[in-house]
Amino acid sequence: MKKLISVILFFSFTVFSQTAENEDVNDKNIEEVVVKGNVLYSDQVNALKTPVPILDVPQTVSIVTDVDIRKQGFREIGDIIRYTPGVNTSQGEGHRDSVVFRGVRSTADFFQDGVRDDVQYYRSLYNVEQVEILRGPNALLFGRGGTGGIINRVTKKAVVGETFTAHDVGIDSFGAADIALDTNFQLENGAALRINLHSDSLANHRDHYDGNRVGFNPTMTLKVSPETTVFLSYEYADHERFIDRGIPTINGSPDESLSDIVFGNSSANVQTLEATIMRAQVEHTLSDTSKANFSFTSSSFDKLYQNIYASGYDGTLVTMDGYYDPTERDNTIMSANLVNELSLGGVVHTLLIGAEFIQTDNENLRYDANWSTTNDDNEIFNITRPMDFTVNSGGVATALDYVTKLNRQTASDISVTSIFIQDQIDLSDNWKLMVGGRLDDFDITVDDIKNDTSESRNDNTFSPRAGVIYKPQENVSLYLSYSESFLPRSGEQLSLIHIWRCRRAI
């Protein structure tokens, strides 16, 4: 892979005022100031909802900041995964993020600002403050799924009291290019507006491969009072790309002699996404040791992927299969939590209490590819570069359509209500204990439109969590942890018709 040649233009403008007179500080006695309280604003992992330092968390966590993203030239989640231990990236059929957490593959365990983001697509990084990768199950904080871990993207928010602008421009030797803008404006009455936008074009060494992505994300921060801050965000995404499913395998390994052949074409292999995400968050400080948080998210996704791919190969001929698969999903998610630090009997407790409600409407259908010569989704072709899918291996003209063979069509309605509580107890400077649990009421109805049937299921699931941390010194921690997660048998994308009892992971 050729290296990315990146040109970065950065402009920063800062407006500030200073009222202190010019004095020689060397002639003054400097008074030592000790600040107490406000511990809720210490460095923390956003997804964990509490201000506990990373070393005091009984879970493996990795953080990649926006500075790391820019320095390394990361453009997608998969780029970050390749640099992170304990997780791997997989192909994702050429149209979605697909992560393997400790051997468990997932295309749905993604979060944005701690809110579920489980539609299958390639997520952009232009508006990301940091990416948090947590390994191991933890349904207490994240609910269903996450059997191997989760990835949380923390988005950039408008900054009150600052004015700055940054530009990124990049181009590589294949012709791929990207441009991004990040600008922050100080408004009146304790408010700020920040605009992030990007546009990129995709290209690499493979035939047919191209695509475009556009993202626009204005955010506003309103300092309503010294204790209350409101964050507002609107995000729009418009993606289109060629789907490359790779090359056939022989004896369990890719046939490298085919590495310069694309088994697809630009008309049959395409993915599109149009999404709007609106978020509102209110943070209210009750005291130096207590804070409440409420968030509301409304999102709408319209996703399509269609493709043909090599489903069989004997060394000389290739069998092609394919399908057309659109999804429409609307989410409404509300969550609230209270974080309180208190001392009981000389022992410090960090208490988290919260609740979450999720309403999801999902519509999905799939048409199998249909070749006119076989009236089936499989057809055999000679291997050429480029591949010719208009004539089969017998020399007979054939045509492909995606409107003849309906495989499935479902409409799903999902409601999830959750409550959770967690207590981290500082027994001493060396020993810490974490205990808690979450109760989820998961209700799903799947209508099988193709066969005119319907199935429903309700699961009430309790997920415990416990951990012990030992710190032999300040910068070292050893932990023993037990946690559970569950995955309803509705499939990651909520479209399965046969709904069985949910599975659990420990």
Regions found by a protein language model. Give the residues of each.
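Acidic, small-polar-rich N-terminal luminal/periplasmic segments of exported/outer-membrane proteins
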Residues: K28-E162, S485
